[in-house]
Each structure stands twice: as structure tokens, then as C-alpha cells.
Amino acid sequence: MLIKQHKQVWWQEQERLKGIRCKLESEIRSCLNEESIGSECFCELMNFEKELSEEWCAYLTAVIDPIQQLRTGLKRWYPTSQSAPCHEGSDATEVLEEVDFVKKQSKAAFERLHQEQWHLEEDLLDLSVKLLDHSSEEKPNLLSEQPMELVTLDCPYPDLKSSILNEFCNFTERYQEKLEDFDLQLEDIRSNFQLSAEEHWTYQAVLDQYPGNLLGRRALYLDMLQRYFPHKSRHHLVEHEKYCDQYHFAREQRRILIDNWSRSRKDFIQKAMLTLLEACAAHEMGSLLAKDRRRQQELCADLKAKVSQWRAQQEELSRLEMEISARRREREEEKEKLWKKKELLRREETEIKIRKYWAMKQQKWQEMEKRDLRRLEELKKLMAEQSVKDRERVKYRQELLEKRLMERKKLALQEVQEEEERERRLEALRKQVAVAVQSDPVRMMSETLAWKARTGSESEEEFILQKPLFTLTTYNEQQIISDPRLRFELALREAGLHKTQYAKEMLPKIGPQKPPRKDTESTVFKV
């Protein structure tokens, strides 16, 4: 899971660095392609770029191309050497010597390139250190310098100007002391670092890869730092992280102090210039109005009072800032002491709990072992008793089974007797509903009274037309009623048994009085 998160972070960092690189390269190209290319600096850059491209082409021709040619030659030579193993070994030795020679050349070239890379990195590091030292030296010099705006400004009152400059010196000395305290604090923290300068650079690069809003950022970069520094324990890395946080906090406080000094210096210069301009204006008014000396003195006193008031305000402000910073430092120290005490107490409580836990576990294991042994003995006794009971139950079940078989035989015999009795009753019922009426086809084919009444008033011709074309041989009412199937169904309906299972079984079994002719049987449902 951590490897997947590392891969995602590496991919994002690679995309970000690639974008920054493309942006810088485009800016450099656009800068080089401007009209100011004729200047000496840009000409040197163009010449340096040309030299780099020529060196790269020479490196490809001298190192990379021979290796590629040797590789392709080995790929072609290997199958032929495998297919013809009976040849002399001189070719193989020559090939191995050539490969060793190319390896030595490439190794020497790579060592030379690594040496040049190391020298370039050292030069860049020295240059960056010089630039940082120069910038860090400039800021204290700026603190010690007097503002040229106040020095060059003419003031008719030297005492006022000297007091303002002295106040500025006192003001800058307080900030200088605070800045020196922060520098000493930074040096003290830097001396406690657990990693070397190169390892610290790697540490900072790893931390910069993981953005601050990433979930689980600390676990990820600690895991990656342990991979980069396997010789360092997690405790050393955590300690270095703590000192780095303190170092960054102190640097941020130092930056805030310098920003406050710049802002206060600007405000002081503005107020001092306003005061001096007011003094100049007052002096001009006094020179024009010589009689109004008293007013000038009052104005000077007022201005001095303002300066002293502003000085008191600045002293109060610096005192409050020092108290706030001291309280913050004390609060941080108290928090760290409290955290250490809590950690020690927590560890002691954890050890006590672990001992109690193992003692309870040992006691529980012994009790469980005793209980299991007792339970094993009880189970053995119960199994012996149960085996005796099981044998008795098997014997009892066998007797019950024999008894049930005898009962089933009796029930089967009784059912057979009941079935015979039912057949006898049904046979008696069949005899009761048997056909007893003789067939009368003449009556069946004769005219009815209704037909006679209908055809009595008509002519003979109409009567002839209404006669059937042929005689229909069918059944009369007596024959239909005499059918045993109909009579059996009517009897069942009267008894309310026409929907029972008995009626469904018996109706298909009853046949007509005369069997049907074979030529009248339908073969539709037999196909």
C-alpha cells in the first residue's frame, strides 16, 4: 500500500519538476533569442551551449556508439558461435578481450564524468554558500547603517537631529541584539542535527516531494527516509525532524523580526522626516517672526516631548515583543517537558500492564488446562455411559421396528379386506343401476306431436320438401336413458359423489351396452 502511494507521489513530483524544467528552458531560450543577444554575457552563454552540444556529440561518438556497435556485433556473433561449437577458441578470447577493453574504457569515462560532476556540485555549493553569507552579512550591515534620508536632511536644530539619530541607533541596537540571539539559536539547533549536510539536503528534498495536504504525509516520508538512510534508526530521524522544525521556526521568527525591523525603520524614518520637516518649518517661521521666540521654544519642547513619547512607545513595543517571545519559548519548553513526562509515565504504565497481562494470561492458561483435563475425564465417563445407553437404545429400537412391521402387515391386510368389501358394495350398486329398458327405434324416428301440429295445415308438396333426405339411425330417449354410464352418473349426482375421486376412477371403466364398431373408432388422438 505504501509503495503505491509512493509511486503516485513520485509521479506527481516528476510531472511538476518536468513542467518547471520546460518552463525554465523556454524562459532561457526566449531570453537568449531576444535582441539583446549581442551583449557579452549572452554571447558567452551561446558559446557555452555550443561547447556543451559539441562535447555531447563527441561523447556519443567516442563512448556510446562503440558500445552499441559492440552489442550488435555480439548479438550477431553469439548465434553463429552456438551453431558451430567445434571452432577454435581464439575468436571467443578475442571477443572477451575486446569486451573487457570496452568495459575499462567506459568505466574510466564514467569515473571521469563523476569526478567532473562532483567538482561542479562543489563549485555550485560554494557559490550558493557565498551568496547566502553575503545576503546574511548585508542584513546586519543594513541594521547598523544610519538612514541617509535623515543624515542628508538639513535641520536647524542639531540637538533634535542628534537625538533622532541616537534614538535610531538605540532602536537598531535592540533589533541587532534580537537578530544575534536568533543567529545563535540557529547555530545551536544546527549543531544538534542528526544528519550530515549532504544527508540533510536529501532529507529536505524527500520532504519537498510530499505536499502538506497529503493524507498520511508523515508516515510516507518517514518510510522513504528509512529507505534512503538504512543506517539511521527511526529515533534519529524523528529527532532530526524535531530539530528541523525548531530550525524552521527560528528562521521564520528571524524573518519576521527582519520584516518588523524594515517596517519599523520605514515608519521611524517617515516620522523623523516629518518631525524634522516640521522643525524646519518652525525654524523658518521663527526666523521670519523673530519676536515669537517663545512659541519656537514651546514648539521645540513639544517636538521633544513627541520624540520622547514615541521613544517610550517604541521601548514599550520592544519590551512587549521580548516578553511575548520569552513566553512562547517558555511555553514550548513546558510543552516539551510535559510531553517527556507523559511519555515516561505512559511507558511505565504500559510495562506494568504488560506484566499484569502476561501474569493473567499464564493463570488463565493454567486454569484452562486444568479445566480441559477435568472436562476430558468427564467426557470419557460420559462416552462410556453413553455407549451403554446407545446399545440399550439400539436394542429397544429394533424391538420397536419389529413391532411396527407387524402392525404395518396387519394394516395392509385390513386395507385389502376393506378394498374387497368396497368392491362388493360397488358391484351391488352397479347391479342396481343396470340398463333395464328395451330399445325402440321406431318410436325414436316417428314424428312428434309438435311436428304434426306444425305440418298439418300445409300442402303435400311442402310436406315432401320438409322430409329428410335420408333416414337417420340414432338413439331414442329410452335408449339414452338406458345407457349404464348416464344412469351411473345420475346416481352419483343424486348422492353428491360426482366430483369425488371414486367417480373420476369409475366413470372411465363403465362401458356401453354394445361395443362400438371398429370402423367408428377415431384415430385422431392415436397419431
Swiss-Prot record:
Coiled coil found in the keyword field: yes
Keywords for the protein's UniProt record, in alphabetical order: Coiled coil
Stretches assigned to coiled coil: 289-353, 401-438
InterPro entries: CCDC148/CCDC112 (IPR039902)
Descriptive protein name: Coiled-coil domain-containing protein 148
Organism whose genome encodes this protein: Mus musculus
